[in-house]
Structures are given as C-alpha cells and as structure tokens.
Amino acid sequence: MTDYTTLEDLEAAIARELAYMDFPPKDWMLEHQHPSGDPVYDVVIEGAGMQGLAIAHALIRQRVRNVMLLDENAVGREGPWITYARMQSLRTPKIFVGPDLGQLNLAVRTWYDIKHGKGAWDKLVKVPKDEWMDYLNWFREVLQLPVENEVTLKLVEAEGDFLRLTIEQGGATRTIYARKLVRTAGIAGCGGKHIPAIVSDGLPSDRYAHSADMIDFAALKGQDVGVIGCGASGFDNAATALEQGAKSVHILMRRKRLQTVVISRAMHSVGYLQHFGDLEDAQRWEIMNHFSGFTPPPPEETLARTTRHDNFHLRADSSLNTVGMTGDKVHVETPSGPIDLDFLICATGFTIDVTKVPELTPLAEDIMVWRDRYDPPAGQENPDLGLHPYLGRNFEFIAKNPEQSPRIADIHEYGIASISSLGPICTGLHGMAFGVERLVRGITRDLFVADGDAHVAQILNVNEPPIAPDSEEDWTI
C-alpha cells in the first residue's frame, strides 16, 4: 500500500502515474463530422455507473478522448447504490479489481485507507455500499470524466456512417451523433423489470412494487408484507421492511428448501472470465441453460438480517396460485396455504428482450438473438435464453442482415444481456477488469480499421524533419 496521508497527495500521485502510463504519447484518433456540420463523438456511453466510468477511463487511457457519458440520474445518484440496492455492503468479496483496472492508487482500498486511516481496509469484510458510492463519485471527479447527468437516451437510429442519438434533458430533446454506442444501462436496461402477470393483473398498482422500484418502506410500518423471490434481492427487501417496522414479512418461494449452491462461483476464474465467449455455441448454451435453473442464495450476512427478526417468515413451496384483493387485503393462495398481506414486493428479476427496449425500437427487429443462431437439443429448450442477444466477441450486437443494417454492430451491449454470449464479466465487480479490456480492445480496433485508408495515407505521406537523438519521440533502439 502507499504512504499517502491525504486525498490531495493521492490525487497528485494519480496524475503523475497517468502521465507516466500515457505511452505512446501520440494522438491517433481522426476527427469526424456529420454532413450537417455537427460534431461526432467517437464513443457515447449510456450509463455513468461503475461500468460506464471504468469504460470511459479505459478508453481515455487508449487516447480515445472524444467520449461522452450520459446518465438519467442526478449527480451522485448513478447506479443502484443509494436508490434501490438494499444490501448493506457489496456482495462481492473485497479482493476484486474494480474500475481502477489494476491501478493501485485509483483502487478503492487505497482511497478507503486514506479516508478512514491506515489499516482500515484490512478490518473490512466487504465494502459498505454507501462508501462504494462515495468512492465512485471521487473516482469520477479525480479523473474528470465527461458525464452529462439527467439525460435520457430516447432513440437510437442509423444514419449513414454514424449513429443518430435522440436525447432528452430538462424537457427538451436534441440530437447527437456517435461512431460507437456502449449501453451500460443496468440490470433492467435490456427489457425491463419482470412483474408476474398474476400480480399485475390481480392487484391495484399501489399494492405491489418491483424490488428495483423506489419503495417507501416507512409507509409499510405496521403492515404485513410479502416478498416473492428467495434470491439475495428478495432477502434485502425483506430485511429493509423488517428494519423499518413492518408487522410481519413473508418471503414466498416456489422451492421446497432454500438453495445453498452458488453455482456462479465456479465461473469466477481467469479461464471463464477471459474465455467464456470463445466456447462453442453448444457449450455456452449448455452452461447458461444449467445456470438459469439456479437462484443465487443470499449471502450469510443478508440472511442474518432477516432471521434475527421473530416476525420474519420463510414460506417454502409457495408459488402463486391466485392473487387478488379480498376486502382491503392482498389475498394470495399458494400450495402451502393462503396468506393475507397489505403489500407485495416482487423480487422476480428482469426481462431480457431487445424488442422491449424503447430506444432500440428502430433497430430491434434486426438484432440477432440466440434463437436466430442456435437450435438447442431436446431437453435444453429455454425460450427465455433464446431471447438473449447473440453478441460478438466485443459485446457488439450482430445484425441478422449486416449488409442492410451495418450500424447495429456499432452498438455494444455491456450489461446483463451479455452473459449468455460472453459470461459473467459485466454483471458485477468480479469480472470488470476482463470485460472492460475486451470491450475497449474491440472498440479501438473497430475505430482504427474503419479509418484504415486515412491511416495508410498518413504513413505514405510522412514528411517530418529528423528527430533529435535526445527527443522523447526517438524510439530507436
């Protein structure tokens, strides 16, 4: 670890370190302009959470500086950490390499030790989520990353050699152009929240919510609350309701017992994180089809937040037979018996379906999904998995007809929808270093190759004066 004692000292060291790492110190990107005369961004990143910040940092380190991040949230509220993430700490063990991408002075551990005193990091088991948000705010500020907040991407269209992006800010819409779009729109960003139809059809909208909604838990004080789903998010929401004074909280799960196997841990190795995307289609499908049958159990500390309360109930074998209103109560019939509640929280995950992403409407029908590419053998059918986008090696969408829709490959889906194609390298922190490197290498390759003729012409027309022997540009060995 470093011996810096103040954040000012650390930030000065980071500036020196970035200058040292800036090699070769030569700009290589060519400026592009739309026929209208409007400027064109090389890369626009939708989402300025931890993934978007890491990607922008990595691109700028590669001297791709004409970058813009757009986020619909206010400054300091990007991502889920202080909105709908209801855990107390990150679920990932603190050994991860985060958006620092291996640069120790930028790492959360270095920042945390300076903020809280030397040795504070060693006492942590996992990073508190509020501290993580503070770190991301500092990370963005110290790197001076270009973020526009409270901006919503409304529409993505192909226009000539570029992507035409319609954005909304402060009630007004405008158009910007980009050569590349990276979507880091979060876990709900490729299809939306999944609410079981039996719930949405049977209840008024003020009697249920999705676990990723902004829920007024204080209003649930003294009420009977049900939570559908026994994953970590379900337990986080149950614990929050209990801590806010709910009369009782009932987790309703289909399974007969709580699952204990964390199958995803088997994929947390260099082999899987680096090369899952290089496996054959049949191998990737078999793994992901098997994976989809498991619900990750809550971490031990999350489970303890609920079980310490006498008014917490875990109801196994409780799939939903009927859901409706009986008087002023939410009445639920399950195989294990009926239950009357005041409010229902659906920790039921997210839909992955590009046709349900509003901003992709003009292009969605031309985006290849797994069912277009792969026909699974008997016994491995999985309609939900078949709707996942079939991505290229660098997270790019693939067009069903590339000649008719060439710009589709300039949209990179860096989120939960990529897991079937490239593995768990952008759905959390454990794979961040692998995912960002793969994405950025692909983007820089595409941008360079697209300007190939111009780069060739530059070399053929080199006519520079001799370089002095002691010049920093003299690379002669």
Sequence positions of predicted segments:
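Flavin (primarily FAD) cofactor-binding/catalytic cores of flavoenzymes
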Residues: 1-73, 78, 121-232, 236-244, ...
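Core mature regions of organelle-targeted
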Residues: 76-86
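Flavin (FAD/FMN) cofactor-binding and adjacent substrate-gating region
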Residues: 86-118, 265-279
